[in-house]
Amino acid sequence: MASPGPAAGMQQKLEAAAAAAGGGDGAEWGRGMQKMEAVGAGGEGVGAGAEQVAPPPRRPVAARKERVCTAKERISRMPPCAAGKRSSIYRGVTRHRWTGRYEAHLWDKSTWNQNQNKKGKQVYLGAYDDEEAAARAYDLAALKYWGAGTQINFPVSDYARDLEEMQMISKEDYLVSLRRKSSAFSRGLPKYRGLPRQLHNSRWDASLGHLLGNDYMSLGKDITLDGKFAGTFGLERKIDLTNYIRWWLPKKTRQSDTSKMEEVTDEIRAIESSMQRTEPYKFPSLGLHSNSKPSSVVLSACDILSQSDAFKSFSEKSTKLSEECTFSKEMDEGKTVTPVPATGHDTTAVNMNVNGLLVQRAPYTLPSVTAQMKNTWNPADPSADPLFWTNFILPASQPVTMATIATTTFAKNEVSSSDPFHGQE
């Protein structure tokens, strides 16, 4: 016989409890029975197996979000009125969040970036305290790279003078000049030759080599430690300095340039007025003068510099300074310059007092000793005998050659061997 289920056993217990209690309200009894049946049904379900329970419903999967666009794409999609949300309102200018300066950058697409293995690189144009100065630096660099047709911050008419100047130098040199005008120019190695940096005070020293007969000449207030420089100033750099020092020209030369431009203008007007309307138009010959007019002389930068008053005064001061230094050195060393009789050679003799002895020295030819020869040979101290010195000093008319030196040495050996005291020594 099968054992009763858990629901039947629970019902029997409830009936027994109700009988013991002496009955009760029928409604309450019915509600209790319904609850117990529900509990029994749940117990049977658990006992029958948990695999019959339905899983809880899942949340609906949300749709994937769209790809977030980059900062450059957002800025490019902004209208002109919303451009103030960027760090700067100008093109090619960004504000550094740490230093607060405005940096100008340029993207050069014509080069290949080997570090990142892609086309194009960012060109740094310097950091500026003023936002407008950084924007103008970007405009100048963009005009140098892409010409007057590119998009810039300010009108092209503001850079009419700069467009003429930037055509005379290379792109690399022009970018260096822009960086040097920035507010945060780094004191690193110099870009140009002739500007060595001093290690003790971090200053630049403009030097010229082989100028006016001097091996080294400093144009700055401080002299370098080792007296060397990076190279000759401006000789190996292909930069036209004529436009930089044109204001050093005399007034007459400036007036001639102005008159030349006026002559060209008058010539154009005369040609245009003489032409008839029926004739086909021809371009006038600009700047071509007739044979009667003298041709203008083209002056280079060196010519302008050599003709200027500043260069002449500079050369005079340097010559005077070198003479004073030479005279002071001679006075310190105890030298006196004395003239020498004319012997057919342009020489100067210098008498130097060394331990009471008179030694005569000449830079090119050595005159003969005119002292009276005396036979006062002393083997202990031969320097008092003039014959001892005649073996070393040649006559003024005899050129110095290798054969002469060999002959003089041989004569000295003969004198030494003929000495009666030579064998005793």
From Swiss-Prot:
Cytoplasm keyword on record: yes
Disruption phenotype: Reduced size of various organs due to decreased cell size, increased cell number, and abnormal cell arrangement and microtubule orientation. Brassinosteroid (BR) loss-of-function phenotype with semidwarf plants, reduced length of internodes, erect leaves, up-regulation of BR biosynthetic genes and decreased sensitivity to BR.
Cellular localisation: Nucleus; Cytoplasm
PTM entry text: Phosphorylated by GSK2. Phosphorylation of SMOS1 leads to its degradation by an unknown mechanism.
GO biological process: auxin-activated signaling pathway; brassinosteroid mediated signaling pathway
Region Disordered: start-end pairs: 43-65
Alphabetical list of Pfam families matching this protein: AP2 (PF00847)
Residues recorded with modification Phosphothreonine: 338, 343, 347
SMART domains listed in its UniProt record: AP2
Chief location: nucleus
Domain of life: Eukaryota
Tissue expression summary: Expressed in the apical region of leaf blades, young leaf sheaths, a broad area below the shoot apical mersistem (SAM) and near the tip of primordial leaves. In developing roots, expressed at the tip of seminal roots and lateral root tips. Expressed in developing nodes and basal region of internodes. In flowers, expressed in lemma, palea and anthers.
UniProt KW keywords: Activator, Auxin signaling pathway, Brassinosteroid signaling pathway, Cytoplasm, DNA-binding, Nucleus, Phosphoprotein, Transcription, Transcription regulation
DNA-binding region of this protein: 89-155
Inducers of expression: Induced by auxin. Induced by brassinosteroid (at protein level), but repressed by brassinosteroid at mRNA level probably via a negative regulatory feedback loop.
A GO molecular-function descriptor: DNA-binding transcription factor activity
A single cellular component GO annotation: cytoplasm
Binding partners and assembly: Interacts (via C-terminus) with DLT. Interacts with NSP2 and SHR1. Interacts with BZR1 and GSK2.
Function: Transcription activator involved in the control of organ size. Acts as an auxin-dependent regulator for cell expansion during organ size control. Binds to the promoter of PHI-1, a gene that regulates cell expansion, and positively regulates its expression. Cooperatively functions in a transactivating complex with DLT to enhance the transcription of the SMOS1 target PHI-1, and to regulate plant organ size. Interaction between SMOS1 and DLT is a crosstalk point for auxin and brassinosteroid (BR) signaling. Acts as a positive regulator of BR signaling.
Family: Belongs to the AP2/ERF transcription factor family. AP2 subfamily.
Name of the molecule in the record: AP2-like ethylene-responsive transcription factor SMOS1
Organism name: Oryza sativa subsp. japonica (Rice)
Chain's gene name: SMOS1
